[in-house]
Amino acid sequence: DSELAGPRGARGPHGLSGPHGLSGLXGPXGYTGPIGMXGLTGLRREESEKVWLESKDGQELELVSSGSAQEELELVSSGSAQVSFASYLGASQPLPSELW
C-alpha cells in the first residue's frame, strides 16, 4: 500500500524560467519584468536610483538608472561585460529575449 503524494506547492516568484535562468525584477515604481541574465537570484533597490542584482555566486551586478524611466539603463557587472538596454521601467512587458 503506497500513499498518494499531495500536490506539489507552486514555486516562488522567480519570473520566467528558461535557458538563461531568468529572474524577476520588481521595483517601487510598480513595474515587473524578467532580466535575461543567467543565475540572478537577488534584487535590492537602494536610495540612489541604483538597482543591485546578486548572482548565485555572490557577485554583484549594478543596474544603473539616471533617474528617468525613459532613459537607458546600464547593466554593469563587476566582471568584464557591460550591457546597455532600453529601459522598460513602467511597462509590464519583459525585456525582449533578443537582447541576450
UniProtKB/Swiss-Prot annotation:
Domain of life of the organism encoding this protein: Eukaryota
Biased composition (Low complexity): 13-29
Chain spans, region Disordered: 1-40
Tissues expressing the protein: Detected at high levels in the urine of pregnant females (at protein level) and at far lower levels in the urine of nonpregnant females.
Protein name according to UniProt: Pregnancy-associated protein bPAP
Species per Swiss-Prot/TrEMBL record: Bos taurus (Bovine)
